Amino acid sequence: MAAWARRDSGEKKVGKNPTDRGKPGTKTSLLVDEQGGPLGAVIDGANVPDCKLLEATIAAIVVERPTPTRQSPQHLCLDKGYDNPTGQQAAASGGHTPHIRRIGEEKKACDRKRGHKPRRWVVERTLAWLSKCRALLVRYDKHARNYLGLIQLACATYWYRRLCRLCNQPVLG
């Protein structure tokens, strides 16, 4: 027995109907800093390739960042899914220097230097933390703007708790 939701129940940010062989569901594209703090989030259907969401994700950054210069360029670490002209062009248009590594390359390069751990898990860890929020684990919202708002609220909660932890203050609520 299979269960699926009609396509119109999630507006245009849900993948195709499962009977159309498209992957159903919602994909969250998240941009984080080096410690896993969320900087920008975008949602779309799960059947949309990651490289097509990169430009919108970069545009969704909510913090002001310094203008990239030759002396201090802005770096963007990406996985192999972005190693194509679309992904590289989106990174360059955002003023970032893309660093794209295959799955094994990062571990091999870091094995030589003690104290340098691979950074591929940072985004996955943040997505795992966001999935602890019950409203984000299973999408109950019909409208995409409501679901994106819940993601942004969870990201704001992350930053609030991080600030309280850095200032040695108790977390309220």
Question: What positions do the PLM features span?
Answer:
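Active-site- or DNA-interface-adjacent structural scaffold in DNA-acting proteins
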Residues: 1-18, 32-34
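Short loop/turn motifs at secondary-structure junctions and domain boundaries
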Residues: 20-23
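Short conserved beta-strand segments at catalytic cores or DNA/RNA-binding microdomains
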Residues: 26-38, 47, 54-57
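Conserved, well-structured core segments
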Residues: 27-30, 40, 128, 138, ...
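Active-site beta-loop-alpha junctions of metal-dependent nucleic acid enzymes
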Residues: 42-67
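Residue-level signal for inorganic ion chemistry
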Residues: 54, 79, 153
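Helix-centered, glycine/charged polyanion-binding patches within enzymatic domains
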Residues: 66-144
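C-terminal domain-tail junction helix/linker
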Residues: 149-173
